[in-house]
Amino acid sequence: MDIRKEFLNYFASKAHTIYPSAPLVPEDPTLLFTNAGMVPFKKIFTGEMPAEVPRATSCQTCIRAGGKHNDLENVGYTARHHTFFEMLGNFSFGDYFKEEAIAYAWEFVTEVLELPVEKLWVTVHESDDEAEKIWQKFVKKDRIKRFGDKDNFWQMGDTGPCGPCSEIFYDQGEEHFKGPEDYLGGDGDRFLEIWNLVFMQYERNEAGELLPLPKPSIDTGMGLERITAIKEGVLSNYDSSLFMPLIDAISDLSKKKYIYKEGASFRVIADHIRAVTFLLSQGVMFSNEGRGYVLRRILRRGVRHGYLLGLKEPFMYRLADKVAEIMGGHYSYLYEKLSTVKEQIRAEEERFYQTIEAGMRLFEEELAKTKTIFSGDVAFKLYDTYGFPLDLTEDMLREKGLRLDKERFETLMQEQRQRAKAAWKGSGDVALSGDFKELLGLKNEFVGYEKLKAHTIITGLLDESFKKCESLKPGQKGWILLEETPFYAESGGQIGDRGEIRLYEGEKIAKVLDTKKFFDLNMSLVEAIKEVKKDEAVEAVVDKSRREIAKHHSATHILHSALRKILGEHVTQQGSLVEANRLRFDFSHPKPLNAQEIERIENFVNEVIAQGIEAKVEEMPIDKAKEKGAMALFGEKYGDVVRVVEFGDVSVELCGGTHVKNSAEIGSFFITKESGVSSGVRRIEAVCGMSAVKLAKSWRESLVKASEEVKNKDILLGIKKLKDEIKDLKQEIKNISSVSAKELASQEINGVRVVIDEVDAGDIKKIIDDLKNAHEKLAVMLFQKRGEKVLIAAGAKGVKLKAGDWVKSVAPVVGGGGGGRPDFAQAGGKNPEKIGEAKKAALEYAKEHL
């Protein structure tokens, strides 16, 4: 049974609109990832946005591996925890309530899924008589249990929408679970919660009071992995058809049989490859911060567990095919992005295998110092810096008969958790509070595509703290809402417009510093010059720099096409910034661009500019736009009707930004820099229009200055002459400072060539290496003054004397210390006047140990 499909079809038959899964990177700036089915509808539940439809249903992909909701460390060791999962849900936005929600849930569970009624139990909130009364129409009273706020009351935060909830439980059988926690409401696995119905009927105010909502709503959630396992009659999510093909593939790769009790590593890898494949397919990239860092941790945890299974080379990228095979029927983009995703995973795996080897060296070094208890600090460093899981470290110690200072490790882990908790402040910068609700519904039309000036009315005013006000005094900053606005709000990488607000007579009353979008409201940040009043008739004037912004925005579209044509279809936009004087474009590509590729890309864009291609801007249904081949950004929210910007057959993109009317207006295009952003993501920075002219002028000035510096009109010839002079001088210095190994004082002791001497200049290590090459048995120690200090270096070959011990013995004579390997060691000292004594000490030590 395709439960996902059955669920969506069932609720579609009940007049629910099917919504596709929203991106894993949410619009909500307080969340790291989409972690529940209701996240895409949060603004509707809070009243910040009107509902487009009264009823909705979805199968939402979710991640819980960072921020507040973090299941990462439990994954693999329980039957239910996952980093990636799918949440089935049905939602009512002020339409139906408890009666229908309960009836729908019961009908789906018993008639569509055909779960046996005798296995089902229900819980309600201890105060919810209404819900219990409705449930009694379907189940016996003794199968309905009441619980308190901890189990059966849901709220979004300290304030806001909230309400009691009702949960449906499935009894997996006493024959399988007989532990002390295996009762309804306990922590055991016998009674599994399969569906949570939230009755959003209150709003909690800042005083903590519960106020009835005028239009109560419904939010439900059922985990697909859990209900699939129940329907298939298995006791663990990992034994279901969603995971077993992956576990079988891991078994084939590792040549190890999967046994449930010993199979945590199999389960970790199976779970993590799903999360990694989906996140990469949706445009999240490996990095050292934010979402990219969580992605990196998930992959590396999977690799570490592969290491436990004996997989010592990249393997996870091979499993991405299986993820696409299992889930690509519903999420077609998994197939579309598969080859790029596999490249990205493999590159990250290769990078981590180098780290594992470095970690093993640290482990071996600490092991040599350990008698019974291994350092918790080193174990934490292995975990935190080198990505070693605690169980891997403990397994290696167990083989050596050693124990770990686990208490110290846990202390450091707790400190890290506290730091991470304090550091996580969300990922966006929009206002999370304020009087925006007061402005919703007011007319706010963007007219900036057609004109840069507009006669309009200030319909709303907020101060800098986003609180409603009637006016702004001179010098005061605040946000204005205009009935018609020519100011473009920051979006799609294009910065927000600046400009002026004038009275009709022409008097300037405010500077527009920026324009942003809050909850679909185009609002401009202003600084008042004169008093700015609500409901005042004004003229809004966009700064002339907008024309330069438009040039750079159009150039990014053409650049995107150039990259896909020259580098390959795997290139997708990962981010952009469009300003008046520059552009920045991030794109997926596994390696740096060479000079030839950069030149080809630059030439392509300039050829399109020279062709003078007319820009065609048209609004059309999104399906038609996709048929035309319009490129859309994964994760961007598009309506049923979209704006398409075309430059002939060169570029077709969905875009709400401002553009030139003809490619010739861009003028010229120069790439100023190509660099890496993170693993698999490159960045191009470029200029066009007047910025390109200014750049060319600055280059010309630099060339003139360079010509003067090298005293040659032909700069390249002048540089070549300077390089030749430097080369000759370096050779002279080398000739002066080199010391012949034959000139050094040496003697033979017990058949071993012993060299102990002071050298004035030269590379000590090279001299020692030359001596080693010349002798089968050698002990050498050299001293060299370096200002007020002294450097000692020693080498040994074919003898029992150890250079590290020799240096440790002699260094204190010159007031220093050091050490190293048996074959080479170094030390430093602060008393160069005692080199003579040190040479004698070195000779005595050599006689004693040779």
UniProtKB/Swiss-Prot annotation:
Q: Which residues form a coiled coil?
A: none
Superkingdom of origin organism: Bacteria
Predominant subcellular localization, coarse grouping: cytoplasm
Give me the comment on cofactor binding. Binds 1 zinc ion per subunit.
The UniProt GO MF terms for this protein read:
alanine-tRNA ligase activity; aminoacyl-tRNA deacylase activity; ATP binding; tRNA binding; zinc ion binding
Cellular component terms per the entry's GO annotation: cytosol
Q: Could you say which EC number(s) this protein's record lists?
A: 6.1.1.7
SMART domains (alphabetical): tRNA_SAD
The catalysed reaction is: tRNA(Ala) + L-alanine + ATP = L-alanyl-tRNA(Ala) + AMP + diphosphate
Q: Cellular location of this protein?
A: Cytoplasm
- Binding of Zn(2+), residues: 553, 557, 655, 659
Required cofactors, per record? Zn(2+)
Q: Which UniProt keywords apply?
A: Aminoacyl-tRNA synthetase, ATP-binding, Cytoplasm, Ligase, Metal-binding, Nucleotide-binding, Protein biosynthesis, RNA-binding, tRNA-binding, Zinc
A GO BP annotation: alanyl-tRNA aminoacylation
Tell me which InterPro entries the record gives: aa-tRNA-synth_II/BPL/LPL, Ala-tRNA-lgiase_IIc, Ala-tRNA-ligase_IIc_anticod-bd, Ala-tRNA-synth_IIc_core, Ala-tRNA-synth_IIc_N, Ala-tRNA_ligase, Ala_tRNA_ligase_euk/bac, DHHA1_dom
Q: Kindly indicate whether the keyword Aminoacyl-tRNA synthetase belongs to this entry.
A: yes
Domain comment, as recorded: Consists of three domains; the N-terminal catalytic domain, the editing domain and the C-terminal C-Ala domain. The editing domain removes incorrectly charged amino acids, while the C-Ala domain, along with tRNA(Ala), serves as a bridge to cooperatively bring together the editing and aminoacylation centers thus stimulating deacylation of misacylated tRNAs.
- Identify the HAMAP family for this entry: Ala_tRNA_synth_B (MF_00036_B)
Q: What does this protein do?
A: Catalyzes the attachment of alanine to tRNA(Ala) in a two-step reaction: alanine is first activated by ATP to form Ala-AMP and then transferred to the acceptor end of tRNA(Ala). Also edits incorrectly charged Ser-tRNA(Ala) and Gly-tRNA(Ala) via its editing domain.
The similarity comment for this entry is: Belongs to the class-II aminoacyl-tRNA synthetase family.
The molecule here is called: Alanine--tRNA ligase
Q: Which organism is it from?
A: Nitratiruptor sp. (strain SB155-2)
